[in-house]
Amino acid sequence: SFAGLNDADVAAALAACAAADSFNHKAFFAKXXXXXXSPDDLKKXXXXLDQDKSGFLEEDELKLFLQNFSASARALTDAETKXXXXAGDADGDGMLGLDEFAVLVKQ
């Protein structure tokens, strides 16, 4: 399982946002019980999402967010990617730091 999450919870969360422009980060994290994950698990999850190991999640990495949970999941639309980035980008630098990602999950 990804970051210690329950596979059935993750499958339900992915199914709920299968349609384009239906992704809502709060609903996804709630369905997957990600908010119950420890801060260490959240940092590990963010580090796994950080494909280029920059310490940040850039828009191209956020776009592929769902595929980290299931290879067959769709990419996020540009609108979904921008909405998730803006929701978590506390310092306005256009990227999510790993700490910002952990805060976003807990919202």
Curated annotation (Swiss-Prot):
Q: Name one GO cellular component term.
A: sarcoplasm
Does the record carry Coiled coil as a key word? no
Q: Where is the EF-hand domain?
A: 37-72, 89-107
Supply the alphabetized keyword list. Acetylation, Allergen, Calcium, Metal-binding, Muscle protein, Repeat
Q: Which sequence positions carry the modification called N-acetylserine?
A: S1
**Annotated Ca(2+) 2 binding sites:** D89, D91, D93, M95, E100
* Alphabetized Gene3D superfamilies for the sequence: EF-hand (1.10.238.10)
- Taxonomically, the superkingdom here is Eukaryota
Any idea which positions bind Ca(2+) 1?
D50, D52, S54, F56, E58, E61
The Gene Ontology terms for molecular function here are:
calcium ion binding
Q: Give the signal peptide range.
A: none
Q: What does this protein do?
A: In muscle, parvalbumin is thought to be involved in relaxation after contraction. It binds two calcium ions.
Q: Mind telling me which PANTHER family this protein's record contains? A: PARVALBUMIN, PARVALBUMIN ALPHA
Annotated family: Belongs to the parvalbumin family.
Q: What is this protein called?
A: Parvalbumin beta 2
